[in-house]
């Protein structure tokens, strides 16, 4: 857990070893974005903006895709997906091929070096959320 408040959690999915990849999940079960109140949506977007600012300010990544995951009978969540240069070599459109990126990361990014970079990104993000 990187950050937590009354409504949301921010975490890094260790199964997807991508530096700067974070997931925001509401604590209450919802399936769709429109099930959040206006206050909750504003809070969620504030978390998104803070994560992206932290990552840019600390040279973790400079470009991102923000993916809203809505599926029937599933829990809504937001993925902050960094667009590292090396990812463009895997595919041209990250949002259309997110599964391809995830599969590639699971097979090729599970290295000590990558996990060290992920841990550093998590540490930086956690510390800056606390300050």
Give the positions of each predicted feature.
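HIT superfamily nucleotide-processing domains
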Residues: 1-131
């Amino acid at each position: 857990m990187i950050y937590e408040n009354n409504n949301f959690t921010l975490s890094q999915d260790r199964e997807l070893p991508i530096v700067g990849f974070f997931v925001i999940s509401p604590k209450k079960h919802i399936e769709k974005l429109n099930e959040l109140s206006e206050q909750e949506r504003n809070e969620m977007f504030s978390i998104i903006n803070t994560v992206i600012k932290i990552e840019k300010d600390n040279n973790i990544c400079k470009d991102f895709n923000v993916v809203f995951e809505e599926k029937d009978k599933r829990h809504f969540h937001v993925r902050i997906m960094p667009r590292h240069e090396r990812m463009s070599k895997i595919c041209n459109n990250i949002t259309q091929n997110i599964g391809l990126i995830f599969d590639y990361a699971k097979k090729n990014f599970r290295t000590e070096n990558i996990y060290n970079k992920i841990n550093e990104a998590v540490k930086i993000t956690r510390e800056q959320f606390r300050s």
